[in-house]
From Swiss-Prot:
Name of a matching Pfam family: Nitroreductase
Signal sequence range: none
E.C. number(s) listed in UniProt: 1.-.-.-
Protein name, as recorded: Putative NAD(P)H nitroreductase SE_2073
One Gene Ontology cellular component annotation held by this UniProt entry: cytosol
Gene Ontology biological process terms from the UniProt entry: 2,4,6-trinitrotoluene catabolic process
Single GO MF annotation: oxidoreductase activity, acting on other nitrogenous compounds as donors, with NAD or NADP as acceptor
Cofactor dependence: FMN
Classification via PANTHER family: NADPH NITROREDUCTASE, OXYGEN-INSENSITIVE NAD(P)H NITROREDUCTASE
Organism (species): Staphylococcus epidermidis (strain ATCC 12228 / FDA PCI 1200)
Family per similarity comment: Belongs to the nitroreductase family.
Keywords: Flavoprotein, FMN, NAD, NADP, Oxidoreductase
InterPro entries documented for this protein: NfsB-like (IPR033878), Nitroreductase (IPR029479), Nitroreductase-like (IPR000415), Nitroreductase/BluB (IPR050627)
Length: 220
């Protein structure tokens, strides 16, 4: 195995769901900005980036979240950086958000926008993505996990630990974030949380996975 391949595999062996971080160790700005950048540069369906990353460093807000986040008890207390990943709601071709992306970010020529809108409409209708608000949100939420995985992998390559978290009371956490002015519930929902930092102790057990023959099939 060449050096680059080994470096990648080593990072995946290094990564584990860190339940408790060392609160005395902080991630440098350079390293954390790199982690965020890998999230920002992650792929998304039709390049629509249906996410928003909120870095929660405020201790009071972390404490409020802790009351309704059973899966993040130690992580909220000890993580160097704690991120909420929001998924955008109601991403359809004619929304202000998509129109902003097409014109303001991607710089589409005006003459090409109707064709994109038609393609987008057909895609969402054919695959029942636009059936209702829930199917639209689920489509966006799934994509946030691509960014999540990339951020965790880049962290591992930097020797930084992480822990993805779904164990939280969605309604209560939504209420807290809405009351705090952090979450606009008309535009976003909470998809997943993730803590970053440096492990307080080494894992008690090594990484265990199924044999590759049990989970990989080749069709030649």
């Amino acid at each position: 195995m060449n050096q680059m391949n080994q470096t990648i595999i080593d990072a995946f062996h290094f990564r584990h769901a860190t339940k408790e971080f060392d609160p005395t160790k902080k991630i440098s700005d350079e390293d954390f900005n790199t982690i965020l950048e890998t999230g920002r540069l992650s792929p998304s369906s039709l390049g629509l980036e249906p996410w928003h990353f909120v870095v929660v460093q405020n201790k009071e807000l972390r404490e409020k979240l802790k009351a309704y986040s059973w899966g993040a008890q130690k992580q909220l207390d000890t993580a160097s950086h704690f991120v909420l990943i929001f998924a955008r709601k109601n991403v359809t071709a004619h929304t202000d958000y998509v129109q902003h992306l097409l014109r303001g970010v991607k710089k589409y020529e005006e003459s090409t926008i109707p064709a994109f809108e038609n393609k987008f409409d057909d895609f969402q209708e054919s695959f029942h993505i636009a059936d209702n608000e829930r199917t639209l949100y689920d489509w966006a939420s799934k994509q946030t996990y691509i960014a999540l995985a990339n951020m965790m992998t880049s962290a591992a390559l930097l020797g930084i630990d992480s822990c993805p978290i779904e164990g939280f009371d969605l309604d209560k956490v939504t209420e807290i974030l809405s009351d705090e002015g952090v979450l606009d519930t008309e535009q976003f929902g909470i998809s997943v949380m993730v803590g970053f930092g440096y492990r307080a102790q080494e894992p008690k057990h090594g990484k265990v996975r199924q044999n590759e023959d049990d989970i990989i099939s080749w069709i030649e």
